[in-house]
């Protein structure tokens, strides 16, 4: 896998209808939450950002099953409201339907800080990692990750 690789592939149900998130350089971007079931039966609620042009081509409504291919993105929220580091999936491709549930991400980048190994209250070995994944135009996504089990040591 090459350095600075960032690919997300998800399939789940839209938990809500897309709403306007922001406008950048005259392009509107919409946000919705994708609910993807884990093997345990718990659902991951993942924020997805979609350009209006893509949403016009593939409309999404609450309850729809949709496949999303894109990248994991981050930015620092300096407004003082909500989380400081905002992480979301930026959709490059939307497809109606799909083999739900599916949740896969592939990342390759540079470690920003020394990894921090620790044990959970249940005694599992994990390791906290901050990964920097560069993208075009001098930007980078800083992504907190957790390694589990043998990979964590």
Model-identified regions with their sequence ranges:
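Single-stranded nucleic acid-binding surfaces, predominantly the OB-fold ssDNA-binding core
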Residues: 1-153
